[in-house]
Regions:
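Bacterial N-terminal signal peptides that target proteins for export
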Residues: 1-12
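Bacterial N-terminal signal peptides
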Residues: 12-20
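Sec-dependent signal peptide cleavage junction
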Residues: 19-36
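N-terminal short beta-loop-beta anion/metal-coordinating cradle
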Residues: 32-97, 103
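Alpha-helix C-terminal capping segments
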Residues: 101-103, 120-121
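Proline-aspartate-enriched helix->loop->beta-strand connector
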Residues: 104-109
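Mid-sequence, gly/pro-rich, charge-dense loop/helix-turn segments that line enzyme active sites
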Residues: 118-175
């Protein structure tokens, strides 16, 4: 990835959440994750998070769908569709659905400034998920976390696996 893009991303705390959408590891490499399956969808919660990506992308088309602006273009040689979802998982899910149904993306990356991600994470740190959990499907008690939902792939822990090829690309671009 080019220096401008790396520098831009290093200016903010970035949480990268990858969602497995059937991108084959063979199709994903440093030059084009998800290209065999479709463009890469990139979702941000806030304008400040999306603006740096829009500026670094050669935009070919802008489209308004359900009150959201979708930017199609090429970012560092990768076909992408960028969108600001707004804050919250319902808005993110709505944009993810549009990316899948309308743009036929091969994968989705969520990037943004996160609040309350832990004491060991500082501003300008990049955090790349290896697995995810829906935070409100359990309760933290004095005895530990008590899982009470069925949101994740692993019914015992609620953890949701991420696409390893997308995580590797995020990691490699950050280093």
């Amino acid at each position: 990835m080019n220096r401008l893009f790396k520098k831009t991303l290093s200016l903010m705390l970035v949480i990268v959440m990858t969602v497995s959408l059937g991108v084959s590891a063979a199709a994903a490499d440093q030059t084009g994750a998800a290209q065999a399956e479709g463009p890469l969808g990139i979702v941000s919660a806030m304008s400040v998070e999306l603006n740096a990506l829009v500026e670094a992308t050669k935009i070919s088309k802008t489209e308004e769908i359900a009150g959201n602006t979708f930017y199609e273009g090429v970012l560092n040689g990768v076909d992408v569709v960028l969108v600001k979802a707004g804050i919250g998982k319902v808005l993110a899910a709505s944009c993810a659905e549009t990316l899948i149904d309308t743009y036929h993306v091969g994968g989705i990356v969520f990037t943004g400034i996160a609040g309350g991600v832990g004491d060991d994470v500082n501003v300008m740190d990049m955090v790349i998920a290896t697995e995810l959990v829906q935070h409100d499907y359990g309760t933290e008690t004095n005895s530990g976390f008590e899982w009470n939902g069925k949101a994740g792939s692993n019914q015992e822990t609620g953890m949701i696996p991420v696409d390893e090829s997308l995580s590797k690309i995020a990691y490699d671009s950050a280093c």
